[in-house]
Amino acid sequence: MVSVQKVPAIVLCSGVSLALLHVLCLATCLNESPGQNSKDEKLCPENFTRILDSLLDGYDNRLRPGFGGPVTEVKTDIYVTSFGPVSDVEMEYTMDVFFRQTWIDKRLKYDGPIEILRLNNMMVTKVWTPDTFFRNGKKSVSHNMTAPNKLFRIMRNGTILYTMRLTISAECPMRLVDFPMDGHACPLKFGSYAYPKSEMIYTWTKGPEKSVEVPKESSSLVQYDLIGQTVSSETIKSITGEYIVMTVYFHLRRKMGYFMIQTYIPCIMTVILSQVSFWINKESVPARTVFGITTVLTMTTLSISARHSLPKVSYATAMDWFIAVCFAFVFSALIEFAAVNYFTNIQMQKAKKKISKPPPEVPAAPVLKEKHTETSLQNTHANLNMRKRTNALVHSESDVNSRTEVGNHSSKTTAAQESSETTPKAHLASSPNPFSRANAAETISAAARGLSSAASPSPHGTLQPAPLRSASARPAFGARLGRIKTTVNTTGVPGNVSATPPPSAPPPSGSGTSKIDKYARILFPVTFGAFNMVYWVVYLSKDTMEKSESLM
């Protein structure tokens, strides 16, 4: 009985053990099957091929996702790898970006062990992609070196990520009224070319604030500072419908260093140089003329060169106003010198006329006639006296002179003439009449004629001149006669008052400082300094940043 009862117990224990072993084996198999399947799939790319083939089987890339149904939403974001350059002349800017688009296409859902299918650009042409274009783009280039720079990924739930590397040249409208203290908001506008908002819309992937990324190292510009960016969206109406347009505004502020060195400082120095001429003597006409003309030409050159870096706008910029005012100061300095020179010449001419103006004139002809008559009467009395004295001398010394040869007639006659000049000479010296000296020649001639008549021929037919009383008186009388002749010869034409004109007054001198120069030395610098103060305070304190449409 004992042996019969033990056999069923052993059989029961062995059955339980087998059941436990079977459960453990099953659990082990279940735990190892996912790993084995994934390992098999990694080792077998044919599985991916089957997945892709199944996705594209019956897929029509001509139809948008949800065609005839809900609106397709395309989420976008931009990563800027390089910003610039910015051209003021062409009013455009260039940047290099990664442009990302994300949408959901339920036709591309799949079931598989991999969450994301990372594919190359070959898959892009086989599926539907948004027809995004840049509305204000002048030129957009997709990079293809060394292969097309495109990224395409399909997620298990049918979400598509499509990324391209683009270089975009976009238009940037600029209003240069405040140039070069200006700021601009350069837009980048993109949207669908064919699908209106009833079929496709655009949104920002990470929200308006973080969907556009511009690293600091990517925004280093020469003439501008990129101070930020803002985003917005708008709806544009056309004859084909309403379209959603996404816009990114890149806010740029111009750097002034280049323009200060190239334009502002040279203009200020040129104006100061033109005002140096106020301190130069007004008689230095060449020096002041060179100052004026040189500074005017310099300002002309600066104004032309300043416009080379700007488009040909029809309005005046802030720099144009500054250059125009500087040019006005320089030109006014030249006009100021012209005024100084003009008024100085007028003053000198007035002074010369005042000095050279003769005293009030009296009738000259009667006076001269009266003086001439007086002189003739004096000469007549002198001739009579001379004749009387000559006759006395002839009678008193006839015996002595009878032995004198006729050959000495000329010398004795000359001596007699010299003696006859004593009375006229004394009369000329004592006479206050200035015309008596001028008529000395006539007096001498009359005396000579008297001597000739006194020396009449003798009864014997010989010429008997009237000699002087003594021979010692002849030299002195001859010397006096020579002085009288010299006086007559130096007087020139008879009737002249004097051979040497009276000393005239010196011409008026134009030396000294003009009142206009004195006023200009103060007025010009003060006015120019006040202009600079107002100019820089207004423009530096003014908000010259152009407002974007999203902030208006």
UniProtKB/Swiss-Prot annotation:
This is Gamma-aminobutyric acid receptor subunit alpha-4. Expressed in the brain. Belongs to the ligand-gated ion channel (TC 1.A.9) family. Gamma-aminobutyric acid receptor (TC 1.A.9.5) subfamily. GABRA4 sub-subfamily. Its main location: membrane. Heteropentamer, formed by a combination of alpha (GABRA1-6), beta (GABRB1-3), gamma (GABRG1-3), delta (GABRD), epsilon (GABRE), rho (GABRR1-3), pi (GABRP) and theta (GABRQ) chains, each subunit exhibiting distinct physiological and pharmacological properties. Potentiated by histamine. Alpha subunit of the heteropentameric ligand-gated chloride channel gated by gamma-aminobutyric acid (GABA), a major inhibitory neurotransmitter in the brain. GABA-gated chloride channels, also named GABA(A) receptors (GABAAR), consist of five subunits arranged around a central pore and contain GABA active binding site(s) located at the alpha and beta subunit interface(s). Alpha-4/GABRA4 subunit often assembles with delta or gamma-2 subunits, in combination with beta subunits. The chain crosses the membrane at residues 260-280, 285-305, 319-341, 516-538. GO terms for molecular function: GABA-A receptor activity; GABA-gated chloride ion channel activity; transmitter-gated monoatomic ion channel activity involved in regulation of postsynaptic membrane potential. GO terms for cellular component: chloride channel complex; dendrite membrane; GABA-A receptor complex; GABA-ergic synapse; postsynapse; postsynaptic specialization membrane. The lineage of its organism: Eukaryota, Metazoa, Chordata, Craniata, Vertebrata. CDD domains: LGIC_ECD_GABAAR_A4, LGIC_TM_GABAAR_alpha. 4-aminobutanoate binds at residues 100, 163. Disulfide bonds join 172-186. Residues 36-259, 306-318, 539-552 are extracellular. Residues 353-436, 448-470, 486-513 are annotated as: Disordered. Residues 500-509 have a biased composition (Pro residues). Keywords: Cell membrane, Chloride, Chloride channel, Disulfide bond, Glycoprotein, Ion channel, Ion transport, Ligand-gated ion channel, Membrane, Postsynaptic cell membrane, Receptor, Signal, Synapse, Transmembrane, Transmembrane helix, Transport. Residues 1-35 form the signal peptide. The keyword Cell membrane applies. Glycans are attached at residues 47, 144, 157. Residues 448-458, 486-499 have a biased composition (Low complexity). It is found in: Cell membrane; Postsynaptic cell membrane. It is a multi-pass membrane protein. Pfam families: Neur_chan_LBD, Neur_chan_memb.
